[in-house]
């Protein structure tokens, strides 16, 4: 499993920081649409405040969106999921799988792997999905 570092405890709309098993890549899930909370989460992984504004502007009507940027040390990924959107549990999980695949693709791009094996891809997707599913459940339990 990826390493977890708590960003904010006791706040369901903030995320743990997950690190990829290879490379210098980390990712979080944000399910809140409140600007201050999104900006605070992004600040935890060293995103410049002006970029947080760009992320929010790009949100539009998307159910979910994956944002990727680099700083001197990390490839950083924020997955935003609109927790107020309609849909059953299977539909919501399917969207999370879609976003997880973007993370897996970025992991392999980051380490220069152009043709990862099927089993390796499946393993990474399983791990990222698991992390995002657990995080999504923690952030949205009781809704």
What are these regions (language model features)?
Residues 1-13, 127-134:
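N-terminal amphipathic/basic-hydrophobic helices that include classical n-h-c signal peptides
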Residues 6, 26-30, 65-69, 74-82, ...:
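Ordered hydrophobic segments in well-structured contexts
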Residues 8-47:
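Charge-rich, low-complexity N-terminal segments
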Residues 44-90, 103:
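Active-site scaffold of zinc-dependent metalloenzymes
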Residues 88, 92, 114-117:
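Short alpha-helix boundary/capping segments
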Residues 107-114:
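Short helix/strand-bridging catalytic loops that position acidic/His residues to coordinate divalent metals
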Residues 115-143:
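Post-HExxH zinc-binding segment in Zn-dependent metallohydrolases
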């Amino acid at each position: 499993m990826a390493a977890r570092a708590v960003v904010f405890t006791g706040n369901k709309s903030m995320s743990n920081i997950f690190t990829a098993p290879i490379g210098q890549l980390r990712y979080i899930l944000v399910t809140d649409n409140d600007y201050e909370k999104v900006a605070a989460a992004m600040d935890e992984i060293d995103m410049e405040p002006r970029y947080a504004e760009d992320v929010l502007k790009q949100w539009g009507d998307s159910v979910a969106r994956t944002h990727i940027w680099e700083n001197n040390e990390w490839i950083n990924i924020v997955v935003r999921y609109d927790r107020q959107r309609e849909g059953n549990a299977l539909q919501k999980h399917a969207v999370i799988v879609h976003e997880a695949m973007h993370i897996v693709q970025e992991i392999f791009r980051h380490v220069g792997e152009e043709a990862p094996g099927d089993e390796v891809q499946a393993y990474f997707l399983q791990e990222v999905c698991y992390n995002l599913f657990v995080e999504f459940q923690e952030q949205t339990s009781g809704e």
